[in-house]
Regions:
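Short acidic alpha-helix initiation/capping motifs at coil-to-helix transition points
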Residues: 8, 35, 53-57, 88-94, ...
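Acidic/histidine-rich alpha-helical segments that form the ligand environment
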Residues: 123-167
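A contiguous pocket-lining binding segment that forms or flanks enzyme active sites
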Residues: 103-136
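Conserved alpha-helical segments that form or flank metal/cofactor-binding pockets of metalloenzymes
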Residues: 71, 75-109
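Preference for long, well-ordered alpha-helical segments
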Residues: 149-152, 159-198
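Short alpha-helical scaffolding segments that buttress acidic/His motifs in well-ordered protein cores
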Residues: 45-48, 62-65, 78-84, 113-114, ...
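Short amphipathic alpha-helical segments and their helix-coil junctions
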Residues: 55-68, 112-115, 147-155
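Mobile cap/lid helix-loop segments that border enzyme active or cofactor-binding sites
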Residues: 1-73, 197-198
């Protein structure tokens, strides 16, 4: 591949060795799909490709969360940025800020989501506040959600949306921990993920 952003041979991008070349058939297929969906091959993809069958399985979940949810893209991006902020994972924040902006999240909201968003509750809708309270408990209290928080969340979201948002937060929490454990290097700003459906 001549495009530098989609070059497999980037060398070491984490604490793991560089991806052996040429990539196997599963990895090549995943990379080709990423490019066909409008994204670049990211450092995280190169690291995950050390276990191609696991990477392929994870991509199915990621694809579903990005393209097949009932919950709005805006609230999903808020949940992702908030979760990434709580686990202090700049890698995912960098990739999701453009997606969140495209989904209708404001710059002021994005700034708040990475810090003490509750001090700026007025810039969020009641449904967004309910979701963010839930996510904070999900991450900071390790899933110990008080009934009052869950009940308020359930007033605004269907059971399917509750599961979608819970899986979104859980998925990005796990990804944040994985990125930190592997010490994956940040991608350049112009190397972007596939945007998915808005």
């Amino acid at each position: 591949m001549s495009d530098d952003h989609n070059n497999y041979d980037r060398g070491k991008v984490s604490r793991l060795p560089a991806l052996p070349l040429p990539p196997d058939a599963i990895t090549r297929q995943m990379f080709d799909e990423q490019i066909s969906r409008g994204g670049h091959i990211l450092n995280m993809h190169l690291v995950n490709a050390h276990a191609p069958k696991i990477a392929r399985a994870r991509r199915h979940v990621t694809y579903a969360l990005r393209n097949e949810c009932v919950a709005s893209r805006k609230i999903r991006e808020m949940v992702i940025v908030r979760t990434a902020g709580l686990v202090k994972q700049q890698y995912e924040i960098n990739h999701h800020i453009p997606l969140a902006l495209a989904a209708g999240v404001t710059r002021e909201q994005l700034d708040a989501l990475q810090g003490d968003w509750a001090a700026k509750k007025a810039i969020f809708s009641a449904a967004e506040v309910a979701a963010l309270d839930y996510v904070d408990c999900l991450v900071e209290r390790r899933g110990d959600i008080p009934d009052a928080v869950f009940d308020e969340f359930a007033k605004h979201y269907s059971p399917q949306e509750i599961l979608e948002l819970t899986h979104t937060s859980n998925g990005y929490y796990a990804t944040g921990v994985f990125i930190r454990a592997m010490k994956i290097e940040l991608d350049p700003e112009d190397r972007t993920t596939a945007p998915g459906k808005f």
